[in-house]
């Protein structure tokens, strides 16, 4: 399966008739060793200014290409939001194949996930969730904002402000402004109501 077949993770469909147009993307590289198949194949996608950026949520690998050649390997540029040391993964026993035991062996090392992604002409913006378990829980989990320079391929990571004692975080995200710039934000619930706080924009 891993060596003889393609493993697309995303697809586009035609507006006219809804039929499949293009399949693209690939499984995270650790899927072969862990035998987890599509279990950790979550993807994030954004399109802006006729460019597409998409990433393996658990693998951290990012691809960007013109929308018109989204399935062209030679037309893509590649970046990374974070790295995974695949030597940490145990190879499952064959008796565990086709079972959730393969997932259980891999999941302790998949403690980061790209929750949102956006691009502009200069940067790729990523919202990183630091996972505590399979269920997203903004009130107890921490998030980071990662910004990647598309020209130099350098990466910076920023923390969101700590929660105050009277605050309950209910969500995080990336917002595109009218001029195309991207701003991270978080949503809080307090006694006075719900507030949305932007962080940045960071230039």
What is each stretch, according to the model?
Residues 1-4, 128-141, 189-199:
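Short, conserved, GDST-rich strand-edge loop motifs in beta-rich repeat architectures
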Residues 18-40, 71-109, 159-170:
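Surface-exposed loop and turn segments in beta-propeller and other repeat-based domains
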């Amino acid at each position: 399966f891993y060596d003889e077949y393609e493993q697309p993770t995303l697809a586009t469909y035609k507006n006219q008739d809804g039929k499949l147009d293009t399949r693209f993307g690939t499984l995270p590289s650790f899927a072969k060793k862990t035998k987890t198949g599509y279990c950790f194949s979550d993807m994030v996608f954004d399109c802006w200014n006729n460019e597409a950026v998409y990433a393996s949520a658990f693998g951290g690998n990012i691809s960007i290409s013109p929308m018109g050649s989204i399935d062209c390997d030679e037309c893509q540029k590649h970046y990374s939001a974070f790295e995974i040391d695949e030597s940490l993964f145990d190879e499952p026993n064959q008796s565990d194949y086709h079972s959730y035991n393969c997932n259980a062996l891999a999941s302790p090392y998949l403690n980061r996930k790209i929750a949102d992604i956006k691009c502009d002409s200069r940067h790729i913006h990523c919202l990183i969730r630091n996972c505590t378990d399979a269920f997203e829980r903004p009130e107890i989990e921490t998030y980071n904002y990662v910004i990647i320079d598309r020209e130099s391929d350098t990466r910076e990571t920023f923390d969101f402000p700590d929660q105050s004692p009277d605050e309950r975080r209910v969500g995080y995200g990336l917002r595109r402004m009218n001029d195309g710039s991207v701003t991270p934000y978080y949503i809080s619930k307090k006694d006075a109501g719900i507030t949305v706080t932007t962080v940045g924009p960071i230039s």
